Structures are given as structure tokens and as C-alpha cells.
Amino acid sequence: MVTIRLTRGGAKKRPFYQIVVADSRSPRDGRFIERIGFFNPLAAGQAERLRLDVAKVDAWVAKGAALSERVATLVKEARKAA
């Protein structure tokens, strides 16, 4: 099954997440199909907190991809901001 989920990057105690489309059997930070955005939970000042290509999310969901719980809330937030 294909899922849209977060992969962790950044440094120790400074997380930065990529929002990716990946096979659910692959490891969290392993192989992915497509990168569709990022999420920076520690963004301060003018730094961008969330960037997400909502059109690509809709396209993948139409193909049968499932959203993780956290990504579902981020998609809702991105739609509200747009």
C-alpha cells in the first residue's frame, strides 16, 4: 500500500520533516516514490513552517494512497492557509 507520510531529517533535537509518498513496507527514512513537501516544526521568524503541493496530494489520494494521521492534519492546515 502506498502512504503519504513524514521522513525525519535535520540534526539532533532539531527535527525537519520531508513529506513523501512511499510504500508502506519501506523504512521511515528509506526509499520513497516522490517528495511533495516539507514541514519544519521549529520554524521561527520568517522561516517557512509548511510547504505542501496539495494538487499532488489529491492526485495520489485519487490513486489510492493513504495519509498518515500527522500528514492528514498538515494537509488540512495547508488547505486552510491557501
UniProtKB/Swiss-Prot annotation:
Record's GO cellular component terms? cytoplasm; small ribosomal subunit
Q: Which UniProt keywords are present, listed alphabetically?
A: Ribonucleoprotein, Ribosomal protein
Q: Which GO terms of type biological process are on file?
A: translation
> What Pfam families does the database record attribute to this sequence?
Ribosomal_S16
Q: Give an example GO molecular function.
A: structural constituent of ribosome
Report disulfide bridges, numbered on this chain.
none
Q: Give the protein family.
A: Belongs to the bacterial ribosomal protein bS16 family.
- What's the protein here called? Small ribosomal subunit protein bS16
